[in-house]
Curated annotation (Swiss-Prot):
Tissue-specific expression: Expressed by the venom duct.
Propeptide: 25-45
GO CC field: extracellular region
Family to which this protein belongs: Belongs to the conotoxin U superfamily.
Main location: secreted
Highest taxon in the source lineage: Eukaryota
Keywords: Disulfide bond, Secreted, Signal
Subcellular location: Secreted
Disulfide bonds: C47-C55, C50-C60, C54-C65
Lineage: Eukaryota, Metazoa, Spiralia, Lophotrochozoa, Mollusca
Protein name: Conotoxin Vc7.4
Domain notes: The cysteine framework is VI/VII (C-C-CC-C-C). Displays a mini-granulin fold, a structure composed of two short, stacked beta-hairpins connected by two parallel disulfide bonds. This newly described fold is derived from the same cysteine connectivity as knottins (ICK fold). The name 'mini-granulin fold' comes from the structural homology with the N-terminal region of the human granulin.
Signal peptide interval: 1-24
Amino acid sequence: MIRMGFFLTLTVAVLLTSLICTEAVPTDKRGMERLFDHVLLKDQRQCPYCVVHCCPPSYCQASGCRPP
């Protein structure tokens, strides 16, 4: 009985993880281009916070960083 509960929990966790990861990836061409541009621009920002996080241009300008 305990094994069945363990495997049921494991199956649900894997299904939820795959659903979340599938939803996080854009499926249209423009979405993929934005994702690729974001990854390239992320390393070019001067602000240490913006290097780690995805900041909107208004945040970067307000904090004195180079906007994306």
